[in-house]
Regions:
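AMP-binding/adenylate-forming catalytic domain of the ANL superfamily
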Residues: 191, 195-197, 532-535, 564-589, ...
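Conserved ATP/PPi-binding loop(s) of AMP-dependent carboxylate-activating enzymes
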Residues: 416-420, 431-466, 505-507, 602-603
Length: 630
């Protein structure tokens, strides 16, 4: 069956489609049906089933005789460490950790915050929570104390599992003082903290509250898997809301496993035992879904990489990883490839490695500009697949389903909506628009299994954020269009569609033009306030390493390119060359913050920012164009 047939089968009978997919999961009690719609528009899936995520991700592979298969490859260029963990070893380690947590009083429904770097123990902590039916909330290691405190107060965890430190290129990030500061600030106090001591820094433990990761496991009975209901929250993952309180996305246990398991073969086209590498972080949704859960649910080998695409030690790190670990599928953010391309524009380092194991490259997290996709296609000679999803959804809304059928790639499009997703482009009034017309991207309810059923302790906010604007739909917050072949194009966040003298224009389309310039490594376009036209586009350009060009000349060339390719209507005349762009740690460019700086508006320092100093550089650059007036 090709894509059209599979999609049609889902449309004809979604209930049968998802019940069939649910057969791939071990259930203690099979669900009586897939969709539970008695509380619409709040839908739930597999509610009356009973199952356990850790059993499905670890124990069942051991039971099936695959205990010797590698579950986790740990490769840490920042600490010069490598080791592997088999499924059998993982089962022993997770059961022991879960037993120790249980002895300290952790049980089904309790929340546990995990504050860890990219080490296998982070996955073990997640799985140990799942084993007990506890609800984990992973917070990106090294996150500021205030932000951690806000999450402690929202999730009210009984315990926090943390590492003593994280390692960034050239520096040690001290986690324990951040954790202590967060607990001091938080109104809610955890009963205890488990500290994984790394040899790079041994943290001081607070007597009575903190226990050592290894010591508290001594002599403890290992824990068995606790069955939970299909709609039991597997985890809470906070996505930084643009204002105020972070939003706690809830992930339901049953649908999460069914959907992720389905994607491994159908989208990524892997088999059990294949090596799958999502080069992300466990603190983000990609790390939850595709470092921890999906590869292990499917019986693959997952990769925990503690390093960066460049600088650990060079722009060849990804290629070394692929050769050394025989990686079949690589999934990363376009930002990572832009960083590699900036350091090694001609891709000369690729030739030093044997990449024959690589079957495909998947990109998500930021719009993948055509220039980056073409560069990767040319060098890697494998399908380069952009796909689109959100923290809220947990897996792809639109993709090229390589395991069903490799569809023609249209550069600039994450291809087509996956079974389960009825994607519609709507105008302001909520009416579907014809192909080729820019509008708000929405998904007709119900959303498929594994997506967020609500926000943690914030149902009213869930409805307001996602359901109220377009009744009967989930509002994605992205803007784009669908072409006549059904391919989706994501042009910008709805906030990044700018209005220039009454014309609605996508900043993403302008970024594509800028990125295509041979000397430009990376770029961003924002809309700044203009008395005459309402808004004007303004571009930021980062140059390739070794590009010895006059900045003003390059600015002149990109201004001309936008005029030629989008037209004078874009009114694109403002651009400035900068050393780097402000980003979140997951690689998303902070366009909204740059807009506020340009307009001289008040802004809150984004919690997820990688390096706050960059905002000062952006302000200085904007002042040369007469913006960011204070």
């Amino acid at each position: 069956m090709g894509y059209k047939e599979v999609h049609a089968a889902w449309q004809a009978d979604p209930e049968a489609f998802w019940m069939d997919a649910a057969d791939a999961i071990d259930w203690d009690t099979k669900p009586s049906k897939a969709l539970f719609d008695d509380n619409a528009p709040l839908y739930e899936w597999f509610v009356d089933g009973k199952t356990n995520t850790c059993w499905n991700a670890v124990d069942r592979h051991v039971e099936a005789g695959h205990g010797d298969r590698t579950a986790i490859i740990y490769d840490s260029p920042v600490t010069h460490t490598k080791h592997t963990i088999t499924y059998g070893e993982l089962q022993t380690r997770v059961a022991s950790l879960a037993g120790a947590l249980r002895t300290k009083g952790i049980e089904k429904g309790d929340r546990v915050i995990i504050y860890m770097p990219m080490v296998p123990e982070a996955l073990e902590a997640m799985l140990a929570c799942a084993r007990l039916g506890a609800i984990h909330s992973v917070v990106f290691g090294g996150f500021a104390a205030h932000e951690l405190a806000v999450r402690i107060d929202d999730a009210t965890p009984k315990a926090i599992i943390a590492a003593s430190c994280g390692i960034e290129p050239g520096r040690v990030v001290h986690y324990k003082p951040l954790l202590d500061g967060a607990i001091d600030q938080a109104a809610h106090k955890p009963d205890f903290c488990v500290i994984f001591q790394r040899e790079q820094e041994v943290a001081h433990l607070d007597k009575g509250r903190d226990v050592d990761w290894h010591a508290f496991q001594y002599g403890v009975e290992p824990a068995d898997c606790v069955p939970v209901a299909g709609n039991h929250p597997a985890y809470i993952l906070y996505t930084s809301g643009t204002t105020g309180q972070p939003k706690g996305v809830v992930r339901p246990t049953g649908g999460h496993m069914v959907a992720l398991h389905w994607t491994m073969k159908n989208i990524y086209n892997v088999e059990p035992g294949d090596v799958y590498w999502a080069a992300s972080d466990v603190g983000w949704v990609v790390g939850h879904s595709y470092i921890c859960y999906a590869p292990l649910l499917y019986g693959c080998t997952t990769v925990v990489f503690e390093g960066k695409p460049v600088g650990t030690p060079d722009a060849g790190t990804f290629w070394r990883m692929i050769e050394e670990h025989k990686i079949k599928v690589l999934f990363t953010a376009p930002t990572a490839f832009r960083a590699i391309k900036r350091e090694d524009p001609k891709g000369e380092l690729v030739g030093n490695y044997d990449l024959s194991s690589l079957q495909s490259l998947f990109l998500a997290g930021e719009r993948a500009d055509p220039d980056t996709i073409e560069w990767a296609q040319r060098l890697l000679k494998v399908p380069v697949i952009d796909h689109w999803w959100q923290t809220e959804t947990g897996y792809a809304i639109a993709a090229n389903p390589l395991g069903i059928e490799e569809l023609p790639v249209k550069i600039g499009s994450p291809s087509v909506s996956m079974p389960g997703w009825d994607v519609q482009i709507l105008d302001e009034a909520g009416h579907p628009v014809p192909p080729g017309t820019l509008g708000a991207i929405a998904v007709k309810l119900p959303l498929p299994p594994g997506t967020l059923p609500t926000l943690w302790n914030a149902e009213a906010r869930f409805r307001k954020s996602y359901l109220d604007h377009f009744p009967g739909y989930y509002e994605t917050g992205d803007a784009g269009y669908v072409d006549e072949d059904g391919y989706l194009y994501i042009m910008a966040r709805t906030d990044d569609v700018i209005n220039v003298a009454g014309h609605r224009l996508s900043t993403g389309a302008m970024e594509e033009v800028l990125a295509a310039h041979p000397d430009v490594a990376e770029c961003a376009v924002i809309g700044v306030t203009d008395q005459l036209k309402g808004q004007l586009p303004l571009g930021f350009l980062c140059m390739n390493a070794g590009a010895d060009r006059d900045a003003q000349e390059v600015v002149g060339e990109v201004v001309k390119s936008v005029r030629d390719q989008i037209g004078p209507v874009a009114a694109f005349k403002l651009a400035v060359v900068v050393d780097r762009l402000p980003k979140t740690r997951s690689g998303k460019i902070l366009r909204g913050t740059m807009v506020k700086i340009a307009d001289g508006a008040e802004f809150k320092m984004p919690a997820t920012i990688d390096d706050p100093v960059i905002l000062d550089e952006i302000r200085d650059a904007l002042q040369t164009l007469g913006y960011a007036r204070t």
